[in-house]
Amino acid sequence: MPIPLLAEGFGRGLSGIPYAWPVIKTVPWIALVVLLKWYFSGATCRAERVMHGKVVLVTGGTAGIGSAVVRELATRGAQIVLLTRHAPNDPFLVDYIQDLRSQTNNELIYAEQVDLASLHSIRLFATKWVDNAPPRRLDMIILCGSVMTPYWGTPTTTDEGLEEEWMVNYLANFHLLSILSPAIRAQPPDRDVRVLFSTCSSYIGAQLDLANTDQKTKSGSVSYARSKLALMTFAYAFQKHLDAYKRPDKMDNNARALIVDPGYSRTPGTRRWLSGGSLVGLFFYLFTWPIWWLLLKSADQGAQSYLLAAMDAAYGQGAGGKLIKECRELEPLREEVQNEDIAKTLWQFSEKQIEQLEKDAAIKRAQAKKEQEAKKENEEATKRQKKEEAPTKNAAADAKPKAAASPKTDAASSATEQKKQTPGSRRSKKAK
């Protein structure tokens, strides 16, 4: 078939080939779309690593890029511990883990309830993990959990009074790693321990304003960018914190902090941001979906830089504190993230903020507990009072029928006495 068509084309020209000109006009556009799709799909991770026996903690591992990372690591045999706000018996979480186990042929996938919007929830989990004796194995922590307010939405606040994006995207990670730090440093010197932070290019235009973290900002994008800038600053400071630790065995530090920028991807968070969190915006997103399909990565494509940071042997040795994007190392575009003075100020501010918030939350929990106990005591007192009043009411109820029946009894007794007295009186009359 192709040979006769080519022969016809050489003999009679393109006019002799059916649909030749439409095909010639269409092919360049198809090639352009394919080229753009290839370009925006990003780099692919070529690294491989045996993950059998590795214990990996993951936040944000039930959706988006985090879900793709979890699936790839579980396929390679890693033991996954998902940190999620859902209870372990939540139907969604149960089905998700069962599906993941069957897809990856890996039964070592578990979940722990950790609400990143609650400092108390984070402390409960982290202290339980650290208090284990001997220290539990920990090979990797992947921090994918984050929230993003739609571009025309207003950021919300948590129950503890913090802006949600500041709390979930930054302070939760700071709090979690601050408590887990002893467990990270207690790992054997031959163990390759990695901590993966998640960032976004929005940090480039952010301002690290620490004065208004407990207030709603006017723009969700501003709040999100600020939280990512703070997280990057903390990541570099955390690496220095690990390096400064002197191991009892005199060995070098074996834990490395790596910062990963996955690029713009079609995740649930991105979809919510583009749609504005509204039904009209969702219709707009669906209408323009071909554009987002072309320009944005899929979740699997966005996970490639995470997989490189998790599996490439080069990141298991040498210095940490590296930024990875498109599967290659880059230098941060903001000098502040590596500034020691700014990092120290941020660290101290975060510690004081957490201390104050936990004190306030503890007072609220104590008050709520007292109110609950008082309510319970009142309910028990009411029940006891009802039980005590019940016999009295029953006795009164029994006394009323007896009182009502007493006149009839008296009348009957008097009639009986009269009957008894009648024969005697008759005999006395006859004697007279």
Predicted regions and their residues:
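C-terminal tail/cap regions
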Residues: 2-35, 314-432
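Alpha-helical membrane-targeting segments
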Residues: 13-43, 151, 204-207, 217-221, ...
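Rossmann-fold NAD(P)H-dependent dehydrogenase/reductase core
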Residues: 38-274, 357-370, 375, 379-386, ...
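Hydrophobic "lid"/C-terminal helical patch
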Residues: 43, 306, 310, 350, ...
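Non-membrane alpha-helical structural segments and their capping/turn regions in soluble enzymes
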Residues: 119, 167-174, 296, 300, ...
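C-terminal helical subdomain
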Residues: 122, 227, 286-330, 342
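Alpha-helical packing segments of well-folded alpha/beta enzyme cores
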Residues: 125, 234, 302-306, 346, ...
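Active-site-adjacent bridging/hinge elements
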Residues: 141-142, 209-210, 279-282, 324-325
